[in-house]
Design a protein with these regions (language model features):
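Short, Lys/Arg-enriched N-terminal segment that forms or immediately precedes the first helix
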Residues: 132-143
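Short phosphate-coordinating micro-motif centered on Lys-Gly-acidic
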Residues: 40-45
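Cyclic nucleotide-binding regulatory module and flanking cytosolic helices
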Residues: 2-31, 86
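Cyclic-nucleotide recognition modules
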Residues: 71-129
Length: 205
């Protein structure tokens, strides 16, 4: 399975009990296969579905002023995939596209049906997820402002070591807000430093 053993890149996923949504999707959902590059929702359209990723992964991308895709987030195996803010909360057109980063399978339901069920069953769920999403967005915003690209890379690798081996380099670079060339330089410097440290450790004192 794809990235099934990787720690959650989305911190809020570990702080919220998604069991009600998971159970509803498992009972009512339909299994849909997405080919790599296929979209769950296109930027500018309404997101119609909420689902659980059964295999593969999805990336959230938005177009910048140059028309280039910028990766803003991911949903991995076992995680919820949807446009929570624009789609689930406000029923507005999505500000991002949700794209299959690999061949993927999703158990999905209509977003309005899931919203109605969850609000009736767990009234505090919407507020809890919204609060955690805001906290995560604010934390990432501060990181982009105050930390260097190397510091952001080190933090990412330290917290989620599997990400480097399981995601394309250009997607990681985009998520970190740096160019592929910058990321290659950072990785090269980090690998060189690690090799040097290992050699020093082998020298007898």
């Amino acid at each position: 399975s794809y990235i099934c053993n990787m720690a959650h890149l989305n911190d809020f996923m570990t702080r919220i009990d998604f069991s009600v949504l998971n159970d509803y999707v498992a009972a009512k959902g339909k299994s849909i296969l997405y080919a790599r590059g296929e979209r769950l929702v296109q930027q500018g359209n309404l997101c119609r579905y909420v689902g659980i990723v059964k295999s593969g992964y999805f990336k959230y991308v938005a177009l910048n002023s140059k028309g280039d895709e910028v990766v803003t987030g991911f949903s991995f195996e076992g995680e919820v995939v949807t446009d929570y803010v624009q789609g689930f909360l406000y029923n507005r057109p999505s500000l991002t596209s949700i794209v299959a980063g690999s061949d993927a399978e999703v158990q999905r339901v209509l977003i309005e049906e899931a919203r109605r069920f969850i609000v009736e069953r767990t009234p505090g769920f919407v507020a809890e997820v919204s609060s955690n999403l805001l906290e995560e967005a604010y934390s990432r915003y501060l990181n982009m402002l105050v930390k260097t690209p190397t510091e952001r890379f080190r933090e990412l690798v330290s917290r989620y070591p599997g990400v480097i081996h399981n995601l394309p380099i250009h997607e990681i670079a985009s998520y970190l807000g740096i160019s592929r060339r910058q990321l290659h330089r950072i990785r090269g410097a980090e690998n060189a430093a690690a090799t040097s440290a290992e050699r020093l450790g082998e020298v007898p004192f």
